[in-house]
């Protein structure tokens, strides 16, 4: 299968994820010639296995602001690939965070981690929570609520969050 065919398939499967599609398209364009020399790669469905994350975790994060009001944000963790070791990747808190951006970042993190000498897979997570303008207490309450939801999916042998 040609890279353009794979990208079209992914565009149809994930139509609202332009950042993710762009990252995959760029990588596939660079490996297409080498990939086509090895028919065993297509038989093993290597491209789908490389491009599609292992797991997407989406959750609500409810936290209390300084006025006592409950606020709600979305939390995410994209566990992209753990073929060479536990998932590892940063957490990003910013109002622009969405699943497409995190899938793109987790995809890239997989390649970055594979180039180190450490056995680590790739992941990325975060929330549409923006710490800008929040008090230290609000940021702390948000982070506590975020980790209360995320903790069941992480651990030293499974997924290791890092700074962004």
Language-model features, listed with the residues they occupy:
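N-terminal ligand-binding/catalytic initiation module
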Residues: 1-164
């Amino acid at each position: 299968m040609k890279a353009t065919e794979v990208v079209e398939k992914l565009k149809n499967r994930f139509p609202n994820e332009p950042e993710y599609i762009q990252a995959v398209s760029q990588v596939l364009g660079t490996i297409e010639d080498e990939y086509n020399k090895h028919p065993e790669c297509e038989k093993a469905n290597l491209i789908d296995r490389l491009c599609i994350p292992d797991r997407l975790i989406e959750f609500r994060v409810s936290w209390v602001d300084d006025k006592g009001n409950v606020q709600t944000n979305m939390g995410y963790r994209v566990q992209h690939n753990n073929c060479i070791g536990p998932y590892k990747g940063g957490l990003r808190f910013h109002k622009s965070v969405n699943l497409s951006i995190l899938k793109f970042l987790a995809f890239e993190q997989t390649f970055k981690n594979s180039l180190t000498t450490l056995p680590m897979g790739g992941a990325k997570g975060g929330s549409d929570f923006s710490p800008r303008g929040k008090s230290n207490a609000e940021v702390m309450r948000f982070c506590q609520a975020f980790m209360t939801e995320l903790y069941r999916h992480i651990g030293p042998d499974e997924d290791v969050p890092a700074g962004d």
